[in-house]
Amino acid sequence: MIVLEGIDGAGKATQANLLKEKFEKAGKQVSMYSYPDYSSVYGERIKSFLYKKITLNVEELFFLYLIDMIKDKKRMMEDIHSGKYLIVDRFFFSTIAYQSAGGFDYSRAKQIIKLIDLPVPYKIFYINVPVEVSMQRKEKQKGKMDVDKFESNKAFLSKVSEFYKKLKNERFYSESWEEIDGTQNIELINDLIVKNINLV
């Protein structure tokens, strides 16, 4: 199970797709997961919040993001036990980072995660990009009017970055955290990830 983390515009989805190609080329079976899952009822609510259609408090948001992942827990475990390689574009680490930045208690968030007992990733790659780069990429990708309320908030994204760094430095939930400079060339980033995984 490989988890890709980072703020908006870090390049997680790009790396997830490149990684999938390389795994499949190496003859591995792959399952892809991405959160929030906008195809789920929980993901739909999250999307409505992000585009300011509904209002949710920080506790509602924390548990909504979490339930969106918990719904897949059984399927994830089945995939792992069947020998599939899981590539996850954001996991509960992002929920902790984003909702702690929004005011949810950081220590409490970590305690709740431990109680839920979601799968432990083999590797967590934190793709680190400056907030300015994140915002530029998102505006270019979506257009200035289509960025969501998190993607357009510089002060908020800076706080999220700090919580990501905290999680990485604490080695929360797994010893296998790796930080990668997300401003590098896309292929170079992918090569670094693949080398770190020891994909044969």
In which residue ranges do the predicted regions lie?
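Walker A (P-loop) ATP-phosphate-binding motif of ABC ATPase nucleotide-binding domains
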Residues: 1
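Hydrophobic anchor at the beta1->P-loop junction of P-loop NTPases
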Residues: 4
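P-loop (Walker A) phosphate-binding loop of NTP-binding proteins
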Residues: 7
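Conserved lysine of the Walker
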Residues: 12
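Hydrophobic positions on the alpha1 helix immediately C-terminal to the Walker A/P-loop
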Residues: 15
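NTP-dependent small-molecule kinase module
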Residues: 20, 132-200
